[in-house]
C-alpha cells in the first residue's frame, strides 16, 4: 500500500524532523556565525543519535568565501568555545581546498565510528541541493542570498530527514531575506506557510487510524435454466 503525505503532514506526524526556522536581521558574517554556532552547540553539542553526531551545514556564496572567510571565522569561534577545529569539514568542489580525505569524510558523515562522523561543522557551496541525504544533519545556516531562490527551500529540506523514533527538531538559520524567500517558496511549492514547518503543539498534531480492508471477494452466480 502507498500513502502520500504532504510536507506539512509529514512533519506534523513524525515522518520528518520538526523545524525551527530562525531569521536574523542586519547579518554580518562573524556575528551571524557566532550566533549560529552558539545556538547549535547549546541545542545539540555532546549528543548522539543512533551513534551519529549532529551536523551543521553552513552554506557560503562561493568557493573563496568558504575557504578564506567562513572557515577562518569558524575556527576562531570554535576555539573560543573550546571545540577543536578538526570538527570542521570543507567541501566546496575545488581540489585546491577539498582533498580526497575530505570527500571520504563527507561520504561518511552518517557512518558511526568513522572520521566523517566526527565532523560536525560542514562548510559547503551549493552542495546538497538534491540527492544528498544526511540523517545526522540537524541544522543549516544560509545568510547569503543564493542565485536561485529555490535553493533556500532545497537547503532547508536537507536537515529534515528523520533519525531515531523520537520527535526531534532541526534548526534553520537564515538572514531575514532568506527567511522571507523560504516562506515564499513554501507557498509556491507546498501551499503552506513557514509557520507550518515549525514545531506544532500537541493540539495541532493529528492522529490517523489506518484500517486495512480485506480484498473484495468475487462470487460467480449461475442463472437458473
Specify the residue positions occupied by each region the protein language model found:
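Residues that line or immediately flank small-molecule/substrate-binding pockets and catalytic motifs
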Residues: 23, 126, 135, 141-144
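N-terminal, helix-rich and Lys/Arg-enriched segments in bacterial and organellar proteins
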Residues: 88-92, 131, 137-140
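SF2 helicase motor core recognition
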Residues: 122-137, 155-159
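Helicase-associated low-complexity regulatory tails and linkers flanking the ATPase motor
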Residues: 1-118, 145-153, 158-225
Amino acid at each position: 500500500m502507498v500513502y502520500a503525505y504532504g510536507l506539512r503532514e509529514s512533519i506534523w506526524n513524525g515522518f520528518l524532523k520538526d523545524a525551527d526556522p530562525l531569521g536574523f536581521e542586519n547579518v554580518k558574517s562573524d556575528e551571524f556565525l557566532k550566533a549560529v554556532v552558539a545556538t547549535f552547540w547549546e541545542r545539540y553539542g555532546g549528543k548522539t543519535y543512533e551513534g551519529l553526531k549532529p551536523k551543521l551545514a553552513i552554506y557560503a556564496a562561493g568557493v573563496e568565501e568558504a575557504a578564506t572567510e567562513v572557515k577562518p571565522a569558524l575556527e576562531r569561534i570554535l576555539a573560543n568555545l573550546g571545540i577543536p577545529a578538526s570538527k570542521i569539514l570543507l567541501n566546496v568542489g575545488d581540489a585546491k581546498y577539498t582533498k580526497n580525505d575530505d570527500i571520504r569524510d563527507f561520504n561518511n558523515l552518517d557512518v558511526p565510528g568513522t572520521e566523517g562522523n566526527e565532523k560536525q561543522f560542514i562548510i559547503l557551496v551549493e552542495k546538497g541541493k538534491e540527492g544528498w541525504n544526511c540523517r545526522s544533519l540537524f541544522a543549516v545556516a544560509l545568510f547569503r542570498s543564493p542565485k536561485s531562490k529555490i535553493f533556500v527551500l532545497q537547503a532547508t529540506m536537507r536537515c529534515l530527514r528523520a533519525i531515531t523514533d523520537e520527535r526531534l527538531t532541526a534548526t534553520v538559520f537564515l538572514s531575514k531575506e532568506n527567511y522571507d524567500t523560504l516562506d515564499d517558496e513554501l507557498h509556491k511549492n507546498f501551499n503552506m506557510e513557514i509557520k507550518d514547518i515549525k514545531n506544532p503543539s500537541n493540539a495541532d498534531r493529528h492522529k490517523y487510524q489506518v484500517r486495512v480492508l480485506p480484498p473484495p471477494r468475487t462470487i460467480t452466480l449461475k442463472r437458473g435454466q
